[in-house]
């Protein structure tokens, strides 16, 4: 959520910046009227409450002096009725105002390129050599099926489209990647490991920004107010919801492995085959809580941690700085890492690394004190995929495929695969 005072004091500038985001701004133009009405009602209510307190004291004095207080008592009742009526109006305005603020996206950072489509994203650099093949390459879904390490058909039979079974060395590869990533982030990058719940309440999804605007994108448990998480970012960020941290506790980072669940409501017809877009997938997520003045330095650090996974796996990738129209709802600045997928002859997203500044912290009420008695300030939150495991499997299968249909296992994963070097056709 945006800082109300910042929007109030810089409305025209904030509106102009938000319009570059290619997001639905809802009833933003009502901000000034609603804000003024809200402040007017608050002032009137406080004025009447002060009068009620004064009249109450006056009645006490009159009763002690055995004076007739009927008129004053009648006035106090009238004031009480006026306060009740104003409270009803104020609650209505507050609800409308809060709903509007909850649906406004974050303000882009000044370093974010202005753009209208994904074509305006800026490529920072590429890493690694794109492999050259002297044979006809296969898509990862054909490789996985031929090697009998993923079963798409039975996943669809048991559940539905965009579900699958990993089996044999496919299940082992998925598990190896998870353990490798968690070891790297915990032992070398200094993150604390976390295994979060995969079901959260409405407050948690509101805190990280998925609700109320994007409820159709998440799976809701019937007849409850519980949801399946779309990413571990949700439970891990909400770990500190409604808490005040010490300055010494910052910066703080968590690496969390979890299953993720997404309805892909807006993705009909896209990536209908393979591992790129599943309703259920596993991911390692990096979340950081930092002081405001450190957050952009921390964004570079976090992005580097995600890049290190790709580098150690020997997977070619590129780093994109996302333009204003492709930031998503919550980010002030975002980098995407895209891994090379040979069969598609293109880079595909495998990680998004974002600085939300205090946008999530305001929604989730996560604060810190610089000194023991100092006024609490909002932390800045960051997160990034470190990495999405299914897409990493797809990239390994395609980039490491051999002419005989086998797939070489990246060297860094072999200790996690029992020393096995190749996944070969049976």
From Swiss-Prot:
Keyword field: Aminoacyl-tRNA synthetase, ATP-binding, Cytoplasm, Ligase, Nucleotide-binding, Protein biosynthesis
An example Gene Ontology biological process: seryl-tRNA aminoacylation
One Gene Ontology cellular component: cytoplasm
The UniProt record lists the keyword Cytoplasm: yes
EC class: ligase
Places the protein is found: Cytoplasm
Catalytic activity: tRNA(Ser) + L-serine + ATP = L-seryl-tRNA(Ser) + AMP + diphosphate + H(+); tRNA(Sec) + L-serine + ATP = L-seryl-tRNA(Sec) + AMP + diphosphate + H(+)
Molecular-function GO terms, alphabetical: ATP binding; catalytic activity, acting on a protein; serine-tRNA ligase activity; transferase activity
EC id: 6.1.1.11
Metabolic or biological pathway: Aminoacyl-tRNA biosynthesis; selenocysteinyl-tRNA(Sec) biosynthesis; L-seryl-tRNA(Sec) from L-serine and tRNA(Sec): step 1/1
Residues reported to bind L-serine: 231-233, 285, 385
Protein biosynthesis keyword on record: yes
Primary site of residence: cytoplasm
Chain sites annotated for binding ATP: 262-264, 349-352
InterPro entries: aa-tRNA-synt_IIb (IPR002314), aa-tRNA-synth_II (IPR006195), aa-tRNA-synth_II/BPL/LPL (IPR045864), Ser-tRNA-ligase_type_1 (IPR002317), Ser-tRNA-synth_1_N (IPR015866), SerRS_1_N_sf (IPR042103), SerRS_core (IPR033729), tRNA-bd_arm (IPR010978)
Task of the protein: Catalyzes the attachment of serine to tRNA(Ser). Is also able to aminoacylate tRNA(Sec) with serine, to form the misacylated tRNA L-seryl-tRNA(Sec), which will be further converted into selenocysteinyl-tRNA(Sec).
Subunit architecture: Homodimer. The tRNA molecule binds across the dimer.
PANTHER family recorded: SERINE--TRNA LIGASE (PTHR43697:SF1), SERYL-TRNA SYNTHETASE (PTHR43697)
Family the UniProt entry places it in: Belongs to the class-II aminoacyl-tRNA synthetase family. Type-1 seryl-tRNA synthetase subfamily.
UniProt-listed HAMAP family: Ser_tRNA_synth_type1 (MF_00176)
Record's comment describing the protein's domains: Consists of two distinct domains, a catalytic core and a N-terminal extension that is involved in tRNA binding.
This protein's name: Serine--tRNA ligase
Native source species: Lysinibacillus sphaericus (strain C3-41)
Lineage: Bacteria, Bacillati, Bacillota, Bacilli, Bacillales
């Amino acid at each position: 959520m945006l800082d109300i005072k910042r929007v109030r004091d810089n409305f025209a500038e904030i509106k102009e910046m938000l319009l570059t985001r290619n997001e639905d701004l809802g009833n933003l133009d009502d901000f000034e009227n609603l804000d003024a009405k809200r402040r007017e009602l608050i002032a009137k209510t406080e004025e009447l409450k002060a009068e009620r307190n004064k009249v109450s004291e006056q009645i006490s004095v009159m009763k002690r002096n055995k004076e007739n207080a009927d008129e004053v008592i009648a006035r106090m009742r009238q004031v009480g009725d006026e306060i009740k009526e104003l409270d009803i109006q104020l609650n209505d305005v507050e609800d409308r105002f809060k709903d509007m603020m909850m649906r406004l996206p974050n303000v882009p950072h000044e370093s974010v390129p202005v753009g209208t489509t994904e074509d305006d994203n800026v490529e920072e650099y590429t890493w690694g050599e794109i492999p050259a093949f002297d044979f006809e390459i296969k898509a990862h879904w054909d490789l996985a099926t031929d090697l009998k390490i993923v079963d798409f058909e039975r996943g669809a039979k048991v559940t539905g489209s965009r579900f699958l079974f990993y089996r044999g060395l496919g299940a082992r590869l998925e598990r190896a990647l998870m353990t490798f990533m968690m070891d790297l982030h915990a032992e070398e990058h200094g993150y604390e490991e976390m295994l979060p719940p995969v079901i959260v309440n409405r407050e948690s999804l509101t805190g990280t920004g998925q609700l109320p605007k994007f409820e159709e994108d998440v799976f809701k448990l019937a007849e409850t107010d519980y949801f399946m998480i779309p990413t571990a970012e949700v439970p891990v960020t909400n770990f500190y919801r409604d808490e005040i941290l010490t300055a010494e506790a910052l910066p703080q980072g968590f690496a969390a492995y979890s299953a993720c669940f997404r309805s892909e409501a807006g993705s009909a017809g896209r990536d209908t085959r393979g591992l790129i877009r599943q309703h259920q997938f596993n991911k390692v997520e990096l979340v950081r809580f930092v002081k405001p003045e450190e957050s952009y330095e921390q964004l570079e650090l976090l992005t580097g941690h995600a890049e290190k996974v790709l580098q150690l796996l020997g997977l070619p990738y590129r780093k994109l700085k996302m333009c204003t129209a492709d930031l998503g709802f919550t980010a002030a600045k975002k980098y995407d890492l895209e891994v090379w997928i040979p069969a598609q002859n293109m880079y595909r997203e495998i990680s998004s690394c974002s600085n939300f500044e205090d946008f999530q912290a305001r929604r989730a009420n996560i604060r810190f004190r610089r000194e023991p008695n100092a006024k609490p300030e909002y932390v800045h939150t960051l997160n990034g995929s470190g990495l999405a495991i299914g897409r990493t499997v797809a990239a390994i299968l395609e980039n490491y495929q051999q002419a005989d249909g086998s797939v070489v296992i990246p060297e860094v994963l072999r200790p996690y695969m029992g020393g096995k070097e190749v996944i070969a056709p049976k």
